[in-house]
UniProtKB/Swiss-Prot annotation:
It is found in: Cytoplasm. The active site is at E138. CDD domains: ASKHA_NBD_PanK-II_Pank3. Homodimer. GO terms for cellular component: cytosol; nucleus. The lineage of its organism: Eukaryota, Metazoa, Chordata, Craniata, Vertebrata. SUPFAM superfamilies: Actin-like ATPase domain (SSF53067). This is Pantothenate kinase 3. Pfam families: Fumble. Acetyl-CoA binds at S192, S195, R207. Catalyzes the phosphorylation of pantothenate to generate 4'-phosphopantothenate in the first and rate-determining step of coenzyme A (CoA) synthesis.
Amino acid sequence: MKIKDAKKPSFPWFGMDIGGTLVKLSYFEPIDITAEEEQEEVESLKSIRKYLTSNVAYGSTGIRDVHLELKDLTLFGRRGNLHFIRFPTQDLPTFIQMGRDKNFSTLHTVLCATGGGAYKFEKDFRTIGNLHLHKLDELDCLVKGLLYIDSVSFNGQAECYYFANASEPERCQKMPFNLDDPYPLLVVNIGSGVSILAVHSKDNYKRVTGTSLGGGTFLGLCSLLTGCESFEEALEMASKGDSTQADKLVRDIYGGDYERFGLPGWAVASSFGNMIYKEKRESVSKEDLARATLVTITNNIGSIARMCAVNEKINRVVFVGNFLRVNTLSMKLLAYALDYWSKGQLKALFLEHEGYFGAVGALLGLPNFS
């Protein structure tokens, strides 16, 4: 499509975040197309738009998260809807082939991408799809995408939320949180691994630390221990398990609380510590192992996040990333852990578009390359 204003990039508008496990895609669907533009629009562009917006599933693994669609927003001076699509990184060659089949390269479009896969698969985009990637730093994209999504209305809903009464499971409930004044903020991005950023303004942020023990670790260990085939299956098993069957607690060692150092009896003293005993190994279920794996990974992330928040003197910690997708269990664990161990000084925050900020940040980079 020819746009009269040369400052605007040509359609279609995409942003990609190619992670170690998932590819996240943000796609802007214009809804203010003029009669002249529609007449000039080439068939391949119509085909791409129709394919992406009329389906909620693509092949056997691609998913459009319809509930996250942002309706009627303005981007680069155009009105449209912002769609969010994800699929496993291992299926990326199929996506590239689809782009080739739909003559994507004839549109002379700019494809902005971030994440490690933007480097790893750059040659595949060029050789299979005749497409050229413009690579963007993933932490820059994460921060820019997060701040942008938080600044636009989520169709009248709150983007940011927390769990009230996190220490009381029966009273714990999701509540909206006003993030209009977001700084300073500690951002904990949980993907295959974990990166932690201290954000002091839209242009002032740094990576504080990270850990290799993230969502990929949870799924990898769960697959080994239980034979599960997917993230969703691993979470389903974890929701039915009891981690204390595998973990050794403070009370297992002290017979109760360790009062001198303020350690309650229910706290985990040793993750999977009970698995050194033959009778415990024989009685533990796959669901228990899945739950213990989830608790181990989540507690570790929460502990590191808390230490970073204290060191950086930041009391709001926002957790993002696809590890938290459909994973209320971990969100509540993080909320509880931060609230308890900080004696109420730290608040765990979450965002509805948890895993898509990198893709949105890449999309926002389009005008720089058009």
